[in-house]
Amino acid sequence: QRLAGGDARSGAHVRKALAQLPHTRLINGYGPTENTTFSCCHTLTADSLNHTTSADSPPIGRPIANTQVYVLDDTLQPVPIGVPGELYLGGDGLARGYLHRPDLTAERFVPNPFYGKAEGNREQGIGNEEQRTKNVGLGPCKAEQLLYKTGDRVRTCPDGVIEFLGRLDNQVKIRGFRIELGEIEAALLSHPDVEQAIVRPWQDDTGRQQLVAYVVEIREQGLGNREQAEAE
């Protein structure tokens, strides 16, 4: 048995692994560090690769034991089966937050609108902030009263299997590391000579990814050194 995690699986690589390891059970493990790495799992087979209608990536499967998953819209309402939404995670594996980052903790670890209701009930949702606040009280929330907002775009299939569709923001993964492109752009823009900046992932012919940054320099009034030298 082999478990794979850290990044979205490539269908081509999965097919190659299945062909070379016919007697090995391959499991696609999904989950962020904020929920103790593995939150969902899916056994990879040739049929599972034909299951998904999204990009060339196999499904991430169903939640593991003592884990709750919800596919919600931007008002924390459950979306219908087959409709894309954002994946929220809860359960025993949920972290307490980010060390010394209360701002990021408040942004990503949100009150669980389903706390106190039947576990995994996808029919209920609480849409406004006042109701959500009352639902968990005014004091500090316990782990079971929170959900982690993953930023991952997914959808649930009729059989309950979850498909990963991509990110809802500019976060990318390169060699297993999560990278916020906006943070790099902000660092570039802090340079006094940079007027505009944009960062994008780039993939070469071998499939290897790296980051590429494009910047526009601030041009001072008058001739620069090169123009002055040419004029002289």
Regions found by a protein language model. Give the residues of each.
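Specific aromatic-rich, kink-prone transmembrane helix
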Residues: 40
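Glycine-/small-residue-rich active-site loops that bind phosphorylated ligands and cofactors
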Residues: 9, 33, 205
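SF2 helicase/translocase ATPase core recognition
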Residues: 30-37
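AMP-dependent adenylate-forming
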Residues: 19, 25-28, 43-120, 134-232
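Acidic/polar hotspots within intrinsically disordered regions
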Residues: 126-128, 135
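Conserved helix-loop-beta element of the AMP-binding
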Residues: 1-12, 20-29
